[in-house]
A protein has these predicted regions:
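Active-site donor-binding acidic/aromatic loop of nucleotide-activated sugar
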Residues: 146-149, 160-169, 176, 225-226, ...
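A conserved mid-protein helix/loop that constitutes part of the nucleotide-sugar donor-binding site
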Residues: 105, 109-128, 138, 145-151, ...
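Aromatic "clamp/platform" in nucleotide-sugar-dependent glycosyltransferases that forms part
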Residues: 188
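Short alpha-helical donor nucleotide-sugar binding micro-motif in glycosyltransferases
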Residues: 168-169, 175-180, 553-557
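A short, active-site helix/loop in glycosyltransferases that binds the activated sugar's phosphate group
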Residues: 45-72, 78-82, 428-446
Length: 575
């Protein structure tokens, strides 16, 4: 609140770090929520910049209407210097009241017992896990208003001897974490809790709710387990699996330590904080002018990984030129575009919004992909041509970026496209020679034309752990011998679909390649894969949502061969 009041007086940029969801800060205290909570919520919207302590916190605020390009992300880092030896484990655990022996597998949590931490789910999940793995013990460090209820719940479930309520731990937390085998968290809401990185420092296998920034640390089945809030059955299964498998605990704990110590150290946090302050100062000093930045228009926000990869590549190029450049994207799903790319985004049909953006920008990019064509829709051709004309008339330089041209079948459309492009476009970059020939055949002679490559080729694959997690979530072993089918519904596909199934059978029986049906456009392509796989008598998998371009590239890099009806599946495979 004070920062919001001083903002205009000082003329300085004001930034705040958001550690928690302001709507939950005063849970259970209605008067404080009504007063302090309301003041905080209003003040937060009046600041220049905000730093979220996880990407999930930033996403939450963007989804509530905060400007997407005014956020930074920083993660809580800790010192990963190896801790000293903490002494006898059993002696320490027994001093806290835990009923343990040499064979016990100890699950631990350090948290306040309040509704947000949802420890009832922890106790229920532990009881379910203990039924399958009697070695399990639960150690709870902390206190709070729900302690009596949790104690009664443990007794009701018959695990009162196996659950130890240790209260607040004195003498630091290193000894507590060093005595655990499994670190657990059951919160309904978090940003990025220190409890998990503290556990990672001690190489602990970890089970947590998939809330806040936690999925950015834990890759499912790769370096830990995630479950949905309140799902005590899933928690119980995870605890039992870890309790019964010493090697699994060791492996997951080591993988989590590797990631946390590299990406979530205190050194990384300090470096990121300094970079954020430098960026804010640059943006504050940036000369304000009537026109600044770029408007980007394409087939974005439709769930097509190829089109979204083009946008990602364009944004990467723009930010390499000017990291502080204002960017507005015309999208069919502006909310998703804002959340994914942290840019301003307006709906394609919101004429007033994108027209206003054009009058404030310096550059308009029509890109990329095959936008100038009338096979899938003539209305889309009219839309893109109208936007090109509007952008130029608004005073922008106009570039068609990474394009494929055609087919434009109607003569009237060819004439209209040539007229608009000749009059209003400054530069065109094309991704293949056929498009150059098509432009010449249409009579386009005025813009500068350059033959380059598809923008998506500059994108890199995601880290292996992220790719492994995407595959494992789909039930696909990360390292097999695979043949990818990236299919789509097209005219006559229903009749031809069995041929893809026959090819999959042949490849499996002849070369030992297991078919994986990958959806490039996740809203449309899964049905094509299901149709082709109908009647298969061999093992096969479906990857209906491989995430962003990086993880799709990573997934396709695990394939021995790719059969594709989608151009960008081939481009991703080549990358």
């Amino acid at each position: 609140m004070i920062g919001a009041m001083l903002r205009k007086v000082t003329g300085l940029p004001v930034v705040t770090t958001v550690h928690s969801d302001y709507r939950l800060d005063y849970m259970g205290r209605p008067l404080s929520h009504l007063t302090f909570g309301t003041i905080n919520a209003l003040a937060l919207r009046r600041l220049d910049y905000r730093i979220g302590v996880s990407d999930a916190m930033v996403d939450l605020l963007i989804s509530r209407g905060f400007p997407a390009d005014r956020f930074y992300t920083i993660y809580n880092g800790i010192d990963f210097t190896p801790p000293p030896t903490q002494g006898d484990r059993l002696e320490y655990l027994r001093s806290l009241g835990a009923d343990v022996d040499e064979n016990s597998v100890v699950v631990g949590i350090a948290a306040r017992m309040n509704p947000v931490k949802d420890m009832a789910t922890l106790v229920r999940g532990f009881a379910a896990g203990h039924a399958k793995c009697p070695r399990l013990r639960l150690l709870i460090a902390g206190d709070g208003p729900e302690k009596d209820k949790l104690t009664a719940l443990a007794a009701e479930l018959g695990v009162e001897r196996q659950v130890c309520f240790a209260g607040w731990i004195s003498g630091g937390m290193d000894r507590f974490y060093s005595a655990l085998d499994i670190n657990a968290l059951t919160s309904l809401s978090e940003t990025f809790p220190y409890a998990l990185t503290e556990g990672a420092r001690f190489h602990l296998a970890t089970v947590s709710t998939a809330v806040g920034g936690i999925p950015y640390l834990i890759d499912q089945d790769v370096n830990g387990y995630l479950f949905q809030p309140g799902d005590w059955q899933a928690l119980g299964n995870d605890l039992a699996a870890l309790g019964n498998d010493d090697e699994l605990r060791r492996r997951l704990g080591e993988k989590l330590y590797e990631k946390a110590s590299t990406q979530f150290s205190i050194q990384k946090t300090v470096s990121t904080q300094l970079q954020i302050y430098a960026s804010i100062l640059r943006r504050h000093r940036r000369r304000s002018s009537a026109r600044d930045g770029v408007v980007i228009c394409g087939a974005y926000g439709r769930g097509n990984a190829g089109d979204d990869a083009i946008l990602e590549a364009i944004l990467q190029e723009m930010r390499s030129i000017d990291p502080d450049m204002p960017i507005t994207v015309l999208s069919k799903d502006p909310r998703s575009t804002r959340l994914t790319y942290r840019v301003r985004a307006v709906h394609r049909s919101n004429f007033l919004a994108w027209h206003t953006a054009m009058w404030n920008s310096r550059l308009y990019i029509n890109g990329g992909g095959s936008l100038i064509q009338d096979v899938t829709s003539r209305r889309s051709l009219w839309f893109y041509l109208a936007n090109i004309r509007a952008a130029k008339r608004a005073g922008n330089r106009v570039q068609m970026y990474g394009c494929g041209i055609g087919p434009v079948t109607r003569e009237s459309h060819r004439s209209l496209a040539a007229k608009i492009i000749n009059k209003y476009v400054d530069v065109i970059t094309l991704r293949e020679p056929d498009s150059l020939e098509e432009l010449r055949a249409m009579g386009v002679t005025e813009p500068e034309v350059l033959l380059t490559a598809d923008p998506a080729l500059i994108l890199q694959k995601a880290p292996d752990d992220e790719t492994d997690s995407v595959l494992l979530r789909a039930g696909i072993p990360p390292h097999g011998n695979y043949l990818c089918f990236a299919l789509r519904r097209w005219k006559g596909f229903e009749e031809k679909a069995p041929l893809f199934g026959a090819a999959a059978e042949y490849a499996y029986r002849t070369y030992g390649l297991t078919p994986v049906f990958v959806a490039v456009e996740k809203h449309l392509d899964p049905g094509a894969g299901q149709l082709a796989a109908r009647g298969l008598t061999i093992p096969h998998y479906f990857l209906d949502d491989a995430g962003g371009a990086g993880t799709i590239i990573g997934a396709l890099s695990r394939m021995q061969a790719v059969v594709s009806m989608r151009l960008h599946a081939l481009i991703f495979a080549a990358g």
